[in-house]
């Protein structure tokens, strides 16, 4: 019973910390999904997220082909100046072999960045800020898990970044090279019971022939202080590529600053079909310090002078009272 209470207390504390502040006592990673949290890593926190993956794509209708290879997703995130601000570098590098399955098979070995982006994210609205009444109730499981309408109001952040695409990149449309802007709106709802719902709405490579729109919906559930599972759907729409991807996976908190994760990606079409598996890790260098708040404990020179003045007045009053008593006692009535 004590173990259950301790586990419940730790879980609620972590959920509360994640809900009411940018900085959290444990690492807050975007992995292993593709969505981005509305919250930053916290000021003076440098965080690295990376993971290799294996990919298989197969197109059945003509022109038919099959892709097999591997890649790595990576990100570096840093909280700068304010709790709401995060600077980040993100990208995916892939190396594969594309085999055209026609009368005469032909192979095309490819390797390049699928995307490489530098940007900044800023939290513009935080409904959980200063929400004292939403802190966990250590005496009521029901109170901690009941639905509250205000939880439907999400935290909202905005993102702006710049893509860089190299010339003759096999993973982009013909003629896509150089720099192009990327913008995103991210929302996050922290529900009771360890559920978190994240949405991303993205406009990528704006102003190019491959300007696509994406949405990502992610639901995560933390069922213990160490384990979390997630399900995610991602829609991509552009003239170059369109797809609906689904991801499932989980993560394990190895320590306060180190997380391991894995996920599976698939879709439901054959132009091409997609199947991928990834394994990853997230690690942070935590130099965060809570902002200093000056506490008035009455030790200023002015306060000390006022206290001494009051003490002197009290001493003088006591002295006058004693002298008065002594005078009354020495009166001669004879």
Language-model features: where?
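Positively charged n-region of N-terminal signal peptides that target proteins for export
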Residues: 1-6
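Bacterial N-terminal signal peptides
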Residues: 7-15
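Transmembrane beta-barrel domains of Gram-negative outer membranes and organellar outer membranes
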Residues: 22-206, 210-263, 267-334
């Amino acid at each position: 019973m004590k173990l259950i209470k301790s586990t419940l207390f730790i879980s609620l504390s972590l959920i509360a910390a994640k809900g009411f502040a940018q900085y959290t006592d444990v690492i807050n990673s975007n992995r292993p999904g593709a969505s981005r949290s509305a919250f930053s890593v916290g000021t003076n926190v440098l965080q690295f997220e990376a993971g290799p993956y294996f990919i298989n794509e197969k197109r059945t209708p003509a022109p038919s082909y099959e892709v097999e290879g591997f890649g790595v997703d990576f990100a570096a995130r840093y909280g700068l100046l304010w709790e709401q601000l995060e600077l980040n570098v993100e990208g995916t590098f892939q190396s594969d072999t594309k085999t055209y399955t026609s009368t005469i098979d032909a192979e095309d070995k490819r390797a390049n960045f699928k995307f490489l982006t530098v940007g900044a994210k800023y939290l513009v609205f935080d409904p959980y800020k200063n929400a004292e009444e939403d802190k966990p109730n250590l005496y009521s499981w029901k109170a901690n898990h009941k639905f509250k309408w205000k939880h439907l109001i999400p935290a909202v952040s905005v993102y702006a970044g710049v893509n860089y695409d190299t010339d003759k990149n096999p993973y982009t449309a013909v003629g896509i090279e150089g720099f192009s802007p990327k913008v995103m709106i991210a929302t996050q709802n922290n529900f009771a019971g360890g559920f978190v719902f994240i949405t991303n709405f993205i406009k990528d490579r704006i102003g190019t022939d491959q300007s696509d729109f994406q949405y990502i919906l992610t639901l995560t559930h933390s069922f213990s202080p160490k384990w979390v599972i997630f399900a995610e759907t991602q829609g991509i729409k552009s003239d170059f590529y369109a797809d609906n991807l689904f991801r499932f996976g989980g993560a394990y908190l190895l320590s306060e600053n180190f997380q391991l994760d894995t996920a599976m990606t698939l879709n439901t079409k054959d132009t091409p079909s997609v199947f991928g598996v990834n394994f990853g890790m997230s690690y942070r260098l935590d130099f965060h310090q809570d902002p200093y708040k000056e506490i008035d404990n009455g030790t200023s020179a002015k306060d000390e002078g006022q206290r001494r003045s009051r003490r002197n007045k009290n001493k003088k009053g006591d002295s006058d009272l004693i002298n008065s008593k002594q005078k009354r006692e020495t009166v001669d009535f004879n």
